[in-house]
Amino acid sequence: MTTRQVEHEYTIGAPAATVYRLLADVSHWPQIFPPTIHVERQATGAHQERIHIWATANGQAKNWTSRRTLDPEALRIDSASEVTTAPVAAMGGTWIVEPLGADSSRIRLLHDSGPSPRPQDLQWIDRAVDTTRHLELAALATTSNHAHAAEERELLSFTDTCTIDGAAKDVFDFVNEADRWPERLPHVATVRFEEPAPGLQILEMDTRAKDGSVHTTKSYRVALDTRKIAYKQVTLPALMTLHTGVWTFTRRPGHHRGELAAHRLHQHANIAKIPRRAGQVADARDYVHSALSTNSRAPWASQG
């Protein structure tokens, strides 16, 4: 059997340098690409890196490791898999960004996958590649356009920090063991929890609001040692189009500091339903910040 190759192409109304920068910086991929949950990066040489990606494919949570070679002069990024997850045996690809003018560019995505002896695996891979790449290219176009036009009003980022007396591992375990939250957190009614691979978690929970209403949220989470837990919420209220965050845990003498860092989300344009003066962007930002900050501090409050 031979290697299977596919090419996708997309035209974007943004400078080639802007598009390339978004592709090169994997730290922002969870905010750019809908399938991407979290990415860890390790530099391995000049313009060389190894990345560990957690993402969804055909609705399933997967993870894999790839090595990448970046060529900022040619606006080209080559990648090849080092560790894959079934049914993928091997996978690689190339991003090529071609300038079409001062404010437009063409993206070419060349993708190849290794042979598989089972027809159903080939069908699964073809469907995953086609769906994922179309989502990624469309999302990249949207993000590139926003980055070129400046989107500060729509992006909200904040950090909450709490200091807790106790062992670092105990606090990490409390956040990590989300399946036990109904017995530990009063606002959590029920939890549906899966861990398809070590450290890769699917968390769906029903929470009670102060008015007694119950809301369902679903998130993918990645637990890394006892250092941090990254998450991406995929069921969102009308006010938001994106919600990602990272719990980071930093040990201090006699204390454990739990820090919710890089908590990023995009606010939806329709903000008229917030329980304050309708239609005010500043009010929407304050409301969302307050709500998320309260939720993020709930586990710490119960540990205090």
UniProtKB/Swiss-Prot annotation:
Purpose: Is needed for correct cyclization of the oligoketide leading to isochromanequinone formation.
Species, as recorded: Streptomyces virginiae
Annotated metabolic or biological route of this protein: Antifungal biosynthesis; monensin biosynthesis
Annotated protein name in UniProt: Granaticin polyketide synthase bifunctional cyclase/dehydratase
Nucleotide-binding listed as a keyword: no
SUPFAM superfamilies membership: Bet v1-like
UniProt KW keywords: Antibiotic biosynthesis
Pfam families assigned to the protein according to its UniProt record, in alphabetical order: Polyketide_cyc2 (PF10604)
